[in-house]
Amino acid sequence: MPKDEVLIAMERKRYHERLLQTGTLAINANGVATNADKDSVISVMIAKGIAEQLMAETNERVAGQTAGASFEMLTMEFVKRTFPQLQHLRPGNWEVLKLGNRSRTKTSTFAQYEHLAYLTELTKANRKLSAMIGNDYMVAPDIVVYRNLCSDEEINATEPIVNDTVCRYADLREKNGGKAILHASVSAKWTMRSDLSLIHI
């Protein structure tokens, strides 16, 4: 099978095409790519090189927040179109969601981080505690992949595995009233700033 016919290669190509089609990635009349930090020579050079490699057309720069939101949406689409195809490796009822500042879903919505909501309330009520630990513990990813909980019917689908006498604290079991389980979080930063590490898909 040719290397460009495998799922990840095809979806990566589509992802790059969508960056161009939506104008998220473009080069303006001054030769500055939309994901460049215009005040950083290195950022401008790297961003332009990437844009040219992906054959970006010359367009005026879109607003930073608009480009950032578009990048997050396109990145979420890429994850949605690829991760579920790994069901045979990671079985489960998965959700891929783009979070935003206005989203009702926060990191504390998930089982592993539900204690953060409690910690936030404590620091609001106690100035000394707030000064001591600050708010650096808050995790704010742009995109999350999480697993929904399983009903007892799903768990017992092939044979009786659980009942009311066992697994009463298992996070995966819906009957226990827990929260969804966070599997992955993605930070999608559009602008190539010199103080941020760079990763590419």
Task: Name each model-derived stretch.
Residues C150-D152, K189-D195:
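Short acidic, S/G/P-rich loop/turn micro-motifs used as interaction or catalytic elements
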Residues M55-V162:
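Acidic-basic catalytic patches of nuclease active cores, encompassing PD-(D/E)XK
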Residues I199-I201:
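Conserved small/polar residues in nucleotide/adenosyl-binding loops
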